[in-house]
């Protein structure tokens, strides 16, 4: 089942639990706007190259639409649509005043020079500048993009609309980026894990973790979890996978990955088959890489008691069912990885106010939001006698549905 089908399925289950009117259900599912543009740029060798860019603006009932822009060879309209919809529910679960959006360009950023990436970003911005904006749609980084990409978008957008730092988040600090934004998703994963374990009478200290993915989210989650006494016993990234049953020295691994661009070759752990990472023995599994990695083929072999979905849509519905029967507790993506968009909201607020916060305030506010959201999610679980994923979906869908009705759009 692809990401869009799985997301639609979860939405429909939540709508049924909430007893939503069929017309309202249909209107909440259909995106507000889908944008597809061609971006032709001159390459460094003088030839022309053409790329297709997408932006799906899913819902704006609760505020400006919000979501990342990814650069990847396999950017797929269905996946972008699914991720835009997930952002709508995620921002509602986090109780921040946004709707959902997502964008992307079908390209391989590793095969483009910095100047080619800049030209591509500027052309894409020129094509969509009148459809995004501070109070309309606020992009952010995603796979294959980062603070520099956001700086180019900000600059190009500002040529048309005047200097507008709040039009994108995840910017460099020198252009109005927020302190704490780089660590935000990983820190949110840690706060969410704490909240879940507390519910089960446990703490992070002494728990054995396996983390799939050691990019921004996975590496920050590993660092913060290890600082809380968690034992990271296995890690993987695009270069390979490593294991140390006594616990990996995370500061040493972070130093190694910075120098060698990956976990491969780290001498403080043994190399293992990357395909086995999800089924390694542990207490808590943190998928922090791609979607759809936990499926019916491997779900029965998973040994973890808890799964923290740091990635978007890492568990497909078939695996969900298998794991539920095994008693595995899954902290769903639309809550678990919402730290990033929450601190993006803080960045947007700081830009609009023209007043920047200290990092301690950013982190304290993030903890407050993550703790409150978990309590709200658990209340929905009790109300509807459902698991955490349906608790999160009913919480998010209900908030968007109520805003839609209040604005007079649900008739």
UniProtKB/Swiss-Prot annotation:
Database matches in CDD domains: NAD_bind_1_Glu_DH
UniProt-listed PROSITE patterns: GLFV_DEHYDROGENASE (PS00074)
GO cellular component: mitochondrion; plastid
Enzyme Commission identifier(s): 1.4.1.3
Catalytic activity from the UniProt record: L-glutamate + NAD(+) + H2O = 2-oxoglutarate + NH4(+) + NADH + H(+); L-glutamate + NADP(+) + H2O = 2-oxoglutarate + NH4(+) + NADPH + H(+)
Keyword match Lipid metabolism: no
GO biological process, alphabetically ordered: amino acid metabolic process; response to absence of light
Top EC class for this record: oxidoreductase
Catalytic-site annotation from UniProt: 102
Keyword annotations: NAD, Oxidoreductase
Keyword Secreted: no
MF annotations from Gene Ontology: ATP binding; cobalt ion binding; copper ion binding; glutamate dehydrogenase (NAD+) activity; glutamate dehydrogenase (NADP+) activity; glutamate dehydrogenase [NAD(P)+] activity; zinc ion binding
Family listed: Belongs to the Glu/Leu/Phe/Val dehydrogenases family.
Designated name of the protein: Glutamate dehydrogenase 1
Organism: Arabidopsis thaliana
Gene name as annotated: GDH1
């Amino acid at each position: 089942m692809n990401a869009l089908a799985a997301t639609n399925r979860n939405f429909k289950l939540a709508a049924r639990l909430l007893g939503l009117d069929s017309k309202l259900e249909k209107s909440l599912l259909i995106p507000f706007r889908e944008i597809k543009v061609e971006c032709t740029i001159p390459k460094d060798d003088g030839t022309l190259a053409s790329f297709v860019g997408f932006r799906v603006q899913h819902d704006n009932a609760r505020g400006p639409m919000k979501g990342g822009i990814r650069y990847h060879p396999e950017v797929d309209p269905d996946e972008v649509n699914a991720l835009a919809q997930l952002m709508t529910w995620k921002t509602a679960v986090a109780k921040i005043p946004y709707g959902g959006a997502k964008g992307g360009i079908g390209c391989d950023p590793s095969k483009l020079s910095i100047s080619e990436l800049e030209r591509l970003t500027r052309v894409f911005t020129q094509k969509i500048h009148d459809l995004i904006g501070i109070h309309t749609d606020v992009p952010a980084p995603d796979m294959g993009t980062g603070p520099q990409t956001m700086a180019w978008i900000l600059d190009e957008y500002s040529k048309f609309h005047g200097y507008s730092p709040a039009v994108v988040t995840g910017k460099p600090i020198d252009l109005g980026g927020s302190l704490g934004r780089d660590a935000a998703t990983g820190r949110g994963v840690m706060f969410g894990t704490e909240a879940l374990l507390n519910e089960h009478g446990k703490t992070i200290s002494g728990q054995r973790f396996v983390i799939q993915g050691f990019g921004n989210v996975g590496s920050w989650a590993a660092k913060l979890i290890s600082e809380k006494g968690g034992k990271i016993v296995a890690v993987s990234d695009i270069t390979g996978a490593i294991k140390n049953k006594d616990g990996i020295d995370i500061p040493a691994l972070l130093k190694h990955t910075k120098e060698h661009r990956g976990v491969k070759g780290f001498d403080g752990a043994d190399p293992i088959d990357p395909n086995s990472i999800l089924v390694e023995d542990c207490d808590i599994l943190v998928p922090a890489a791609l979607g759809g990695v936990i499926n019916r083929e491997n779900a029965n072999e998973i040994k973890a008691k808890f799964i923290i979905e740091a990635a978007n849509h890492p568990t497909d519905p078939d695996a969900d069912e298998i794991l539920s029967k095994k008693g595995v507790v899954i902290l769903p993506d639309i809550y678990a990885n919402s730290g990033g968009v929450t601190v993006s909201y803080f960045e947007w607020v700081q830009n609009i106010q023209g007043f920047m916060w200290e990092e301690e305030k950013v982190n304290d506010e993030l903890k407050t939001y993550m703790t409150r959201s978990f309590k709200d999610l658990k209340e929905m679980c009790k109300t509807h006698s459902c698991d955490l994923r349906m608790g999160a979906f009913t919480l998010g869908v209900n908030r968007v549905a109520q805003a839609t009705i209040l604005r007079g759009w649900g008739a």
